[in-house]
């Protein structure tokens, strides 16, 4: 038996999942704790392994989100996954949080991702390019695109300007919560493994200085 481990600390708390990767009917177990901190990651993994009936030695691949996200969350998540992979027993894959979220759409290659960075500013992934831009720039970018889906967080889903935009362009909205992390497994074929990963700690205030 072989398992893939998915870890996301770029959003609220910790989300973690185990997927059996070499079975016709794979076992899958996920744990989400929006109040969890980095020091609880080991306990969450132990609980997942026990519930799945797996051992750490059976985990052969680890995927971790690299942000954008909070400094403390990303730092602990990346360090935790690097520690798990340091022995060389498992490969470590780092992926952009926005790239990972795009996998929640039925057709990731035809999806944009919009999540809140701060008031009136958003992180946008469109055509494999990621940006930190204002609301009016999101509107302009998506109006000139041909996306069929937009993966959004709760803030984007409730923003009146963006809601009107999504309706105008005829794109189906997909909320970024409640979807299985196993949807990210397709990214194993798109990114190269590395024992060292660099998270996107850059804060929105940095990007504002560039405009």
Where are the regions that the model predicts?
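Oxyanion-binding and handling regions
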Residues: 1-25, 38, 93-211
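Surface loop/turn motifs at the tips and blade-to-blade linkers of beta-strand repeat domains
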Residues: 31-32
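Short, well-ordered amphipathic alpha-helical segments that serve as non-catalytic structural scaffolds
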Residues: 37-52, 98
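Generic recognition of short, well-ordered alpha-helical segments
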Residues: 40, 75-79, 161
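Buried hydrophobic packing segments
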Residues: 45, 80-84, 102
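Phosphate/pyrophosphate-binding loops at sites that engage ATP/ADP/AMP, CoA/4′-phosphopantetheine
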Residues: 45-61, 138-147
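Stable alpha-helical structural segments in soluble proteins, enriched in small hydrophobic residues
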Residues: 48-52, 81, 87, 178-190
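DPxDG-like acidic metal-binding loop motif
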Residues: 61-92
């Amino acid at each position: 038996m072989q398992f893939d481990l998915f870890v996301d600390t770029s959003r609220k708390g910790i989300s973690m999942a185990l997927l059996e990767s070499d079975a016709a009917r794979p076992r899958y177990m996920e744990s989400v704790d929006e109040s969890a901190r980095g020091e609880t990651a080991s306990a969450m993994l132990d609980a997942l392994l026990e519930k799945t009936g797996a051992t750490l030695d059976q985990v052969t691949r680890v995927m971790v989100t690299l942000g954008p996200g909070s400094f403390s969350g990303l730092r602990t998540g990346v360090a935790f996954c690097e520690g798990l992979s340091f022995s060389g027993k498992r490969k470590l894959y780092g992926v952009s949080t926005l790239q990972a979220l795009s996998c929640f759409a039925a057709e990731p290659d035809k999806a944009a991702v919009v999540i809140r960075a701060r008031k009136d500013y958003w992180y946008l992934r469109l055509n494999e390019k990621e940006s930190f831009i204002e609301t009016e720039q999101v509107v302009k970018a998506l109006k000139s695109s041909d996306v069929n889906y937009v993966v959004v967080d709760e803030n984007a889903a409730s923003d009146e300007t963006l809601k009107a935009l999504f309706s105008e362009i005829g794109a189906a909205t997909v909320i970024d919560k409640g979807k299985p992390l196993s949807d990210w497994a397709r990214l194993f074929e798109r990114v190269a493994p590395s024992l060292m990963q660099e998270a996107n700690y850059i804060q929105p205030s940095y990007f504002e200085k560039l405009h």
